[in-house]
Structures are given as structure tokens and as C-alpha cells.
Amino acid sequence: MEKVKAKKQYGQNFLKDSTILDKIIQSMPNNNNHIVEIGPGLGDLTKNLVKYKDLTAYEVDTDLIGILKSKFAIEIEKGNLKLIHTDVLEAWDKLKNLHDGKYDLIANLPYYIATNIILRAFEDELCEHIIVMVQKEVAEKFTAKTNDKEYSSLGIITELISINSKILFDVPAEAFDPPPKVTSSILYIKKDMSKSLDKDFNKFLKACFIQPRKKLSKNLTTIFDKNIIFEIYKELNINDNVRPHEVSSSLYSQMYTKVKNGRNK
């Protein structure tokens, strides 16, 4: 069969290293959850996942859909694999949930939409575990804590929505075909299924970090009324000189609740 060329517009880098594939399988939680895979590519991870659990895979590339249907004809016929040809973000817009029961997201994500996919998985109340391949710098942002250099809105949201988050291991460029120009990491997040976040909370955090090295109050008063921010600082005993990376996730949550009760400029 003619070699399939990766398409840049879909951010395709096919994971081929069997050792890495095995390590991903070993990291799967021991539960009865369904599995959702986004961007199965040529099916190298899919082949391993479907041995253990039923699987729903979302693929946007028409050429790859044909290959996957042929490669997994038996699994599809048996009902072990459901292959959906669509853009996964559009699917989330229409369906709200990627599966009709509790599921774990396990995938080698395209770099260019990885952050958006993880944030949507946070919103999906049926998604419990997230085990995904992403660019190392992205994984570090999702797992960063207060005062870390990489600390941003992503780390804050992750800390508030999860029970556990960590980088399991790094993956070198040579594990892929074609090799990307960056190091990748496997990011693991176990969500706290009792928690959910206000959709506008992320917008609030982005405003807080719009100039990350400036004082937090400076960032906030460009969007919100100065008197409201002053009162919130006073109520929560926040130092006026504090920078965005020095504030804990729980304090950001308290600030947001109070800002919601105030008024925009």
C-alpha cells in the first residue's frame, strides 16, 4: 500500500513507536468507562485501545476515514469500534457530550487544537480521565502551580476542575512520522466529576494574565471598575502589588465570584 502523507492542515504526526504506544495503554485507568479517541490517524493507538475496551474515534480527514474503515472492518462490524467522520469541536457544539455515558479521552492530539480540545473535555461532564499527547510546553502549562514560570489560566482551571494532573512522560520527536519539531508529553488529568466551571471564568482568567508580568490589579482595572476591584482586594486581603502568577487558583475563584456580582466598565 502507498505510504500515507501527513497533512499539515490537520497537524498530523503519526505515532509509530510501539514502546510509547504500550506505555499509553499501561496508563489507562482500571474502570468500566468507554474510550473516546480524537484523531486516530492510521490507527496505531486505536489498534491497541480496542483490544481492551469499546471505542469511539473521531477523525476529520476523509482519506484516513477510508483507511480506518478498511483496517478495522471487523471491529466496526462487531460494534467494538464506532468511527465518526467529523470535526470533533463541531461535534461538541452539536452534542455537548462525545459519548452518551461516562468516558475517558485517550488520544494523540493535533498540536494546533490540543488546548481547545482539553478545555472542551473539562466542560463535558461525562469525560472523567484525559490522557493525551500534546506539545511539552502545553502539558507544562496545564500542570503548572502558583509561582511556576508556566503558571497561567490553564493551570488554574486544571487545579480547580481536577483531582490529579501530571505529566506521565516525554515523547521524543523520532517516535513520530513525520517527526515534529518539538518534544511531546503525555498529559494525565483525572477530573473531579462533582465540579464544573462557569464558562466565563476562562475569559476572566485571560484578562488577569493579559500582561502577566504587570500587577494583577492593573490588568483587572482595564476591564472592570476600579472601585469594584479595590473592594475585592480589601475583602480578600490581597496585596496590591501581587502579580498574576503569585495568586492561588482558589483565590482566583473567589475573586471571580465577587467580580460577577459587580459591573463591567
Curated annotation (Swiss-Prot):
Top EC class for this record: transferase
Keywords annotated in UniProt: Cytoplasm, Methyltransferase, RNA-binding, rRNA processing, S-adenosyl-L-methionine, Transferase
Gene3D superfamilies: Ribosomal RNA adenine dimethylase-like, domain 2, Vaccinia Virus protein VP39
One Gene Ontology MF term: RNA binding
Subcellular location, record wording: Cytoplasm
EC number: 2.1.1.182
Binding site for S-adenosyl-L-methionine: 13, 15, 39, 59, 87, 108
This protein's record includes keyword S-adenosyl-L-methionine: yes
Reaction(s) the record says it catalyses: adenosine(1518)/adenosine(1519) in 16S rRNA + 4 S-adenosyl-L-methionine = N(6)-dimethyladenosine(1518)/N(6)-dimethyladenosine(1519) in 16S rRNA + 4 S-adenosyl-L-homocysteine + 4 H(+)
A Pfam family that the UniProt record links to this protein: RrnaAD
GO cellular component, one term: cytosol
Disulfide bonds: none
UniProt-listed PANTHER family: DIMETHYLADENOSINE TRANSFERASE, DIMETHYLADENOSINE TRANSFERASE-RELATED
Family: Belongs to the class I-like SAM-binding methyltransferase superfamily. rRNA adenine N(6)-methyltransferase family. RsmA subfamily.
Task performed by this protein: Specifically dimethylates two adjacent adenosines (A1518 and A1519) in the loop of a conserved hairpin near the 3'-end of 16S rRNA in the 30S particle. May play a critical role in biogenesis of 30S subunits.
HAMAP family, A to Z: 16SrRNA_methyltr_A
Protein name: Ribosomal RNA small subunit methyltransferase A
Annotated organism of origin: Aliarcobacter butzleri (strain RM4018)
Lineage: Bacteria, Pseudomonadati, Campylobacterota, Epsilonproteobacteria, Campylobacterales
